[in-house]
């Protein structure tokens, strides 16, 4: 029987099942049962089984595959961005070329007031001077005195369109004008409504 004078002490050779005696500094017993109080703190299967080497291989393969997918996704996105940058660079180059051409055409000699919407014909004298005329090479016939360089239409934004691109440019401008002339539908009201709320 237990000594009534010392609580928590057991007689030698006695004790409950699943309880081992391990005397500490104070002589108290330490309960070593894997389920103290009936609760399993860890899984005996996972703590005592020998690890399968194939699990480590599969884990390494999964990590490597994830790295490859991430690298491929990043490469695809960067490729799209690079294509967009190249397209923007080409657009910027064309804008600069058109601006330089328009500036040169505006500096060509002209003895008339240029009006947007009209076609003007560019000629070059033997001296190298370039000038605008309203007379086309067909109207000159065989008596055209100078070299014909090209025909241009002056747009309302004061830019120049080569004659061969006038039809396409006019169609584009017409489409934009049509879109701008359409009435714009107002978006639905997004303000909060208090209808249906109890007073």
UniProtKB/Swiss-Prot annotation:
Any matching Pfam family: DUF2452
Coiled-coil ranges per UniProt: 71-104
Keyword list, A-Z: Coiled coil
Single GO molecular function: identical protein binding
InterPro entries hit by this protein: DUF2452
Tree of life domain: Eukaryota
Protein name: Uncharacterized protein C1orf50 homolog
Species the sequence originates in: Mus musculus
């Amino acid at each position: 029987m237990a000594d009534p004078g010392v609580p928590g002490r057991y007689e030698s050779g006695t004790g409950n099942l699943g309880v081992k005696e391990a005397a500490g500094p104070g002589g108290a017993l330490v309960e070593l049962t894997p389920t103290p109080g009936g609760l399993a703190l860890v899984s005996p299967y996972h703590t005592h089984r020998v690890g399968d080497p194939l699990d480590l291989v599969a884990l390494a393969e999964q990590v490597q595959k994830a790295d490859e997918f991430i690298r491929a996704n990043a490469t695809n996105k960067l490729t799209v961005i690079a294509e967009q940058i190249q397209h923007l660079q080409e657009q910027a180059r064309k804008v600069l070329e058109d601006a330089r051409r328009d500036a040169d055409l505006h500096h060509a000699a002209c003895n008339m007031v240029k009006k947007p919407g009209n076609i003007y014909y560019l000629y070059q004298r033997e001296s190298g001077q370039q000038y605008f005329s309203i007379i086309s090479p067909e109207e000159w016939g065989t008596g055209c005195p100078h070299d014909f360089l090209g025909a241009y239409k002056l747009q309302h934004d004061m830019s120049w369109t080569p004659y061969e691109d006038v039809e396409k440019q006019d169609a584009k401008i017409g489409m934009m004008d049509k879109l701008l002339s359409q009435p714009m539908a107002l978006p639905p009201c997004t303000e909060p409504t208090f209808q249906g709320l109890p007073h």
